[in-house]
Amino acid sequence: MVTSTGGQGPLEGAVIAVAGAAGPAGRATLMRLAEAGAVVVGSDSNPERLAEAVDAARYAHGGATVIGETVDLLDLDQTREWAARTEKEFGRIDGLVHLVGGWRGSSTFAETDLGDWDLLHKLLIRTVQHTSLAFQDALERSGNGRYLLTSAAGASKPTGGNAAYAAAKAAAEAWTLAMADGFRKSGGEQGPRAAAAILIVKALVHDQMRAERPNAKFAGFTDVKELAEAIAGVWDRPAQEVNGQRLWLTPEP
């Protein structure tokens, strides 16, 4: 069981689970949460990349508790077991950061491949459904829990070639807002004991992308380090203030 060390901020000693921890956004988030003093439990379907991400966060912040678990988030039972195992080992869960991503698109609406929808439904919707259902109770028990989804501005202003992606992102947002309403109702007059919120970007950029395309401007893109900073900052605000909110990291369309 983990207890707060009485450190400098709300994340000191907090237990945060990160789904999709092995990608660039996941790596940056592991780093930032470890820096803030959190116990970080990352999951991913790629064990090799997950191990690299966990090792990097541990190395950057010596003494930080950062662990990784290979979890199939398309399996609800596995996802529930991950949540139960994490709460049993560390005594509570104060956050679930959902960073599972993927993209498929086409040149025009007419060329949309419905196979892309099938894939994106699994990656962008089903994993959100499973993590939210698996972690909801533990986040409320925390008293300061957060469920954070990263989404794209395109969900609010879809383009013809992005039909499947935008629709999947919009569905994931709706699901997360429904979770937020559940938190609101269960909190009653005292306000929600946990919050579900959505961080919205145009797109993400990281150092490797810049190295591969040195002349690209990536206008309006959010660096994964900026996203990680915004994620950590959500715990600085009261649950009632952020619950059910879209937190825009790019201009709202």
Where are these predicted regions, by residue range?
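C-terminal helical subdomain
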Residues: 190-194, 198-200, 206-207, 214-253
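Canonical Rossmann dinucleotide-binding motif of NAD(H)/NADP(H)-dependent dehydrogenases/reductases
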Residues: 4-41
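Catalytic Tyr-X3-Lys loop
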Residues: 110-129, 148, 172
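Conserved glycine-rich Rossmann-like NAD(P)H-binding loop of the short-chain dehydrogenase/reductase
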Residues: 38-52
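Catalytic loop of short-chain dehydrogenase/reductase
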Residues: 140-141, 145-191, 203
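Active-site loop of short-chain dehydrogenase/reductase
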Residues: 14, 63, 92-93, 139-153, ...
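Conserved mid-core segment of classical short-chain dehydrogenase/reductases
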Residues: 80, 101-118, 137, 161-164
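Amphipathic alpha-helical dimer-interface segment in Rossmann-like NAD(P)H-dependent oxidoreductases
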Residues: 84, 88, 122-143, 180-181, ...
